[in-house]
A protein has these predicted regions:
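C-terminal, non-catalytic macromolecule-binding modules
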Residues: 162-182
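Carbohydrate-active enzyme catalytic cores, enriched for enzymes
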Residues: 3-162
Length: 182
C-alpha cells in the first residue's frame, strides 16, 4: 500500500499526496504498535511471530506521515545492508532503499497500553518486567479465523511464555463450509 502511495506521490511531483490522512499514519504505525522485542511481533491467526522488518521502508513511511514512532523504530532496526530484502521487493523499492539515509536516532518506545477497538486488539507492555501481553477478540466470520474466537499471547522479552498453538495443516476442508467441524 505504501509503495503505491509513494509512486503516486513521486510521479505527480507531490500533487497527489495522501500521506496526511490520519488513517494512512495509523496503518503505518500498526507495525510499531505490534512490535514486542527485537524481531518479535504480536501474531494472531496464521501470522508468524518473528519477522524481519524493512527499516528503510519504515523510515520512508515515517517521514511521509510525520511519525516519530515509525522514524525511531526504523533507526532501531537499521543495518548497513539495504539489499537484505531484495528478493521479496520491487525494483522501485530497491532504488528507494539504496537512497534512503538512516534517520536520526531517537529512543524507540511504544505506549504501555495500545487498543485497536475495530480489531478487538489490546496490547499491554511492561518495560520493568519485560512482560508483553496481547489479546484479540474475534469471531469465525473474520478473515483468517477458522474456529477462532480470540487469542492471547504473552512474551517475556523475545521469549514466548504463552502462545496460540498455531495452525494445523491446511486442507481443502479448512476453507470449506465444513471448517467448523475440524
Amino acid at each position: 500500500y505504501f509503495d503505491c502511495l509513494e509512486v503516486l506521490y513521486d510521479l505527480t511531483g507531490g500533487r497527489v499526496d495522501i500521506f496526511d490522512e490520519p488513517l494512512v499514519q495509523k496503518m503505518g504505525e500498526y507495525i510499531a504498535d505490534f512490535r514486542l522485542q527485537g524481531d518479535t511481533y504480536v501474531n494472531f491467526a496464521d501470522a508468524p511471530h518473528r519477522i524481519r522488518a524493512d527499516a528503510r521502508l519504515i523510515a520512508r513511511f515515517g517521514r511521509r506521515v510525520r511519525s516519530d514512532k515509525l522514524t525511531a523504530m526504523a533507526a532501531s532496526l537499521w543495518t548497513d545492508a539495504p539489499y537484505r530484502f531484495w528478493i521479496a521487493t520491487t525494483p522501485y523499492r530497491h532504488i528507494k532503499n539504496l537512497l534512503e539515509e538512516k534517520p536520526a536516532a531517537a529512543a524507540y518506545t511504544t505506549e504501555n497500553r495500545i487498543y485497536y477497538p475495530n480489531l478487538q486488539v489490546f496490547i499491554a507492555k511492561d518495560a520493568r518486567t519485560g512482560l508483553e501481553l496481547a489479546a484479540k477478540g474475534g469471531h469465525n466470520a473474520e478473515s483468517h479465523n477458522h474456529n477462532d474466537i480470540g487469542n492471547i499471547v504473552l512474551f517475556r522479552g523475545e521469549e514466548p511464555v504463552f502462545i496460540d498453538g498455531g495452525v494445523a495443516t491446511y486442507t481443502k476442508t479448512t476453507f470449506s463450509d465444513k471448517r467448523y467441524t475440524l
